[in-house]
């Protein structure tokens, strides 16, 4: 799998996670020479053995960018302060985003390649695209020490973003959050929010065949 990132030229430190597990990663840096043409400026390889498989999904990175002082982190702390377990915390964060955020159709129609969410601005506006929803929830859950993957792939034929969460005692739960004692319900915060949890939307998001993962951040 090839992950492509835009590098800033402002001298700002950024984090790019190695999310495909243990192994050897090829790292290449390309410089824009003119127009859409690029030349390779640097290459190396990195062999990684994780001391903890969750580490890439517990810290900020370029796509899930937050600090201890972020408003998103403060909101997560407020939502989770009386929650006793990971599942309760995940449910609280999910319900907050689904019930308070609206989908930004204008932004979706004009967003440019290379767009990166500003989680605090999204939280303040209470609206965004699927990438924004997933980034805000990922930041909130990671700040609560709950491993969370921001996943990019396809929902049907639509390029889309959602989250996978690790629940203590259960393991990685792909695209899901709610357990009613028998079944998990898929967690796709964008569709659930825009569809107001209608029967047709819930039927769609609970069908795993509608989703195809490409990248995890």
Task: Spell out what each predicted region is.
Residues 1-87, 173, 208-217:
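N-terminal accessory/pre-domain segments preceding catalytic cores
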Residues 60-124, 173, 182, 187, ...:
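Secondary-structure boundary elements
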Residues 89-93, 126-141:
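Active-site nucleophilic cysteine motif
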């Amino acid at each position: 799998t090839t992950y492509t990132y835009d590098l800033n030229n402002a001298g700002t430190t950024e984090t790019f996670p190695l999310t495909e597990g243990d192994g050897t990663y090829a790292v290449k840096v390309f410089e824009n020479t003119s127009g859409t043409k690029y030349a390779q400026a640097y290459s190396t390889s990195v062999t990684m053995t994780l001391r903890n498989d969750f580490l890439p999904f517990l810290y900020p990175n370029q796509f899930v960018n937050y600090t201890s002082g972020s408003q998103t982190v403060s909101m997560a702390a407020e939502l989770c302060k009386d929650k006793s377990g990971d599942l309760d915390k995940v449910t609280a964060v999910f319900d907050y985003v689904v019930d308070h955020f609206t989908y930004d159709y204008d932004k979706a129609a004009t967003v440019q390649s290379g767009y990166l969410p500003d989680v605090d601005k999204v939280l303040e506006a209470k609206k965004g695209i699927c990438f924004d929803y997933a980034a805000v929830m990922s930041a909130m859950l990671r700040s609560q020490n709950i491993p969370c993957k921001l996943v990019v792939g396809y929902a049907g034929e639509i390029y889309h973003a959602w989250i996978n969460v690790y629940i203590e005692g259960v393991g990685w739960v792909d695209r899901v959050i709610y357990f009613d004692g028998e079944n998990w319900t898929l967690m796709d915060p964008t569709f659930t929010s825009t569809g107001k949890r209608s029967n047709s939307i819930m039927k769609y998001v609970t069908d795993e065949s509608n989703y195809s993962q490409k990248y995890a951040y």
